[in-house]
């Protein structure tokens, strides 16, 4: 189309009479289609002649262009790929994956340190257990003292008892706990109700006595060492018939000392095999 216009414009200029018209340079279409013409000679003054139509040569050019349209555009080759874009924002974290397979076993560890030495024990003719004392060693450091204390605590003689009261008692008498559950070392005698020390050291004792009431009286229970009261407990009959008296002690005992529980008035309830009233103790560590 542009080629046709370039050919048609000069032809139109040649076909127009000299001085008959001038063209306003406002674009090729207006130059061809909208010329300004002056009034022809002999016409009324100031009259404007009608615009002349296209020339024969211009019409031939336009017909030739419509009969033979310009060739179609040819698509060029594909261009090179563009540059990579900028990275996008980070996406949200994904869901946790399934657990992986179990790994192989690790290597064998180093051997542990040697354990604490135990105490050498001997058995007497009566079946009791005694401790063989060694000679006095030299002064050790703090670590050696701790080791000796642990050795004595965990490797010393095992002494413990736990007994219950089957028969009821009242008045002022030693409670004979005749239901023996535990008696390591055989240091408790159920016929006397007394614990007899054979290994010097620190011991723990506790007792719980159920009062048999209903008559408005109270009950006292004392833990004694060699006849001396070391702990006391009281239970009162406050319109409920039954009440407990309990206490605990930590004592240092020498060989031959005796520990027991004695009533100091009132009534103690015997529980058959239910063990409502109990007495127990054990060796914390020997001297």
From Swiss-Prot:
<dbReference type="GO" id="GO:0043083">
    <property type="term" value="C:synaptic cleft"/>
</dbReference>
<dbReference type="GO" id="GO:0005581">
    <property type="term" value="C:collagen trimer"/>
</dbReference>
<dbReference type="GO" id="GO:0150053">
    <property type="term" value="C:cerebellar climbing fiber to Purkinje cell synapse"/>
</dbReference>
<feature type="region of interest" description="Disordered">
    <location>
        <begin position="65"/>
        <end position="144"/>
    </location>
</feature>
<dbReference type="GO" id="GO:0098686">
    <property type="term" value="C:hippocampal mossy fiber to CA3 synapse"/>
</dbReference>
<protein>
    <recommendedName>
        <fullName>Complement C1q-like protein 2</fullName>
    </recommendedName>
</protein>
<dbReference type="GO" id="GO:0042802">
    <property type="term" value="F:identical protein binding"/>
</dbReference>
<dbReference type="InterPro" id="IPR008983">
    <property type="entry name" value="Tumour_necrosis_fac-like_dom"/>
</dbReference>
<dbReference type="GO" id="GO:0005576">
    <property type="term" value="C:extracellular region"/>
</dbReference>
<feature type="signal peptide">
    <location>
        <begin position="1"/>
        <end position="21"/>
    </location>
</feature>
<feature type="compositionally biased region" description="Pro residues">
    <location>
        <begin position="84"/>
        <end position="104"/>
    </location>
</feature>
<comment type="function">
    <text>May regulate the number of excitatory synapses that are formed on hippocampus neurons. Has no effect on inhibitory synapses.</text>
</comment>
<keyword id="KW-0176">Collagen</keyword>
<dbReference type="GO" id="GO:0032991">
    <property type="term" value="C:protein-containing complex"/>
</dbReference>
<keyword id="KW-0964">Secreted</keyword>
<dbReference type="GO" id="GO:0090128">
    <property type="term" value="P:regulation of synapse maturation"/>
</dbReference>
<feature type="domain" description="Collagen-like">
    <location>
        <begin position="76"/>
        <end position="118"/>
    </location>
</feature>
<dbReference type="InterPro" id="IPR050822">
    <property type="entry name" value="Cerebellin_Synaptic_Org"/>
</dbReference>
<comment type="subunit">
    <text>Forms homotrimers which can further assemble to form higher-order oligomeric complexes. Interacts with ADGRB3. May interact with ERFE. Forms heterooligomers with C1QL3 and C1QL4, when proteins are coexpressed; this interaction does not occur after secretion.</text>
</comment>
<dbReference type="GO" id="GO:0097107">
    <property type="term" value="P:postsynaptic density assembly"/>
</dbReference>
<feature type="compositionally biased region" description="Gly residues">
    <location>
        <begin position="127"/>
        <end position="141"/>
    </location>
</feature>
<dbReference type="InterPro" id="IPR001073">
    <property type="entry name" value="C1q_dom"/>
</dbReference>
<dbReference type="GO" id="GO:0099645">
    <property type="term" value="P:neurotransmitter receptor localization to postsynaptic specialization membrane"/>
</dbReference>
<keyword id="KW-0732">Signal</keyword>
<feature type="domain" description="C1q">
    <location>
        <begin position="154"/>
        <end position="287"/>
    </location>
</feature>
<dbReference type="GO" id="GO:0098978">
    <property type="term" value="C:glutamatergic synapse"/>
</dbReference>
<keyword id="KW-0325">Glycoprotein</keyword>
<dbReference type="Pfam" id="PF00386">
    <property type="entry name" value="C1q"/>
</dbReference>
């Amino acid at each position: 189309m542009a080629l046709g216009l370039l050919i048609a414009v000069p032809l139109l200029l040649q076909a127009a009479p000299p001085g008959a018209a001038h063209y306003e340079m406002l674009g090729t279409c207006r130059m061809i289609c909208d010329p300004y013409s002056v009034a022809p000679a002999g016409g009324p003054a100031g009259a404007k002649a009608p615009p002349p139509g296209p020339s024969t040569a211009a019409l031939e050019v336009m017909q030739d262009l419509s009969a033979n349209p310009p060739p179609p555009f040819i698509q060029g080759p594909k261009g090179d790929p563009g540059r990579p874009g900028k990275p996008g924002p980070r996406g949200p974290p994904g869901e946790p994956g399934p657990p992986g397979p179990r790994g192989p076993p690790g290597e064998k560890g180093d051997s542990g340190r040697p354990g604490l030495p135990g105490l050498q024990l001997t058995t007497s003719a009566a079946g009791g257990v005694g401790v063989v004392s060694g000679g006095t060693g030299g002064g050790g450091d703090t670590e050696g003292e701790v080791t000796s204390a642990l050795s004595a605590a965990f490797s010393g003689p095992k002494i413990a008892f736990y007994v219950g009261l089957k028969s009821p008692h009242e008045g002022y008498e030693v409670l004979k706990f005749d239901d023996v559950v535990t008696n390591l070392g055989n240091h408790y005698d159920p016929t006397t109700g007394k614990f007899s020390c054979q290994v010097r050291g620190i011991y723990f004792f506790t007792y719980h006595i159920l009062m048999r009431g209903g008559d408005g009286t109270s009950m006292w229970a004392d833990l004694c060492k060699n006849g001396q009261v070391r702990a006391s407990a009281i239970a009162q009959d406050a319109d409920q018939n039954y009440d407990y008296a309990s206490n605990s002690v930590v004592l240092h005992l020498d060989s031959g000392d005796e520990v027991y529980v004695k009533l100091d008035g009132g009534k103690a309830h015997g529980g058959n095999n239910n063990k409502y009233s109990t007495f127990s103790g054990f060796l914390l560590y020997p001297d």
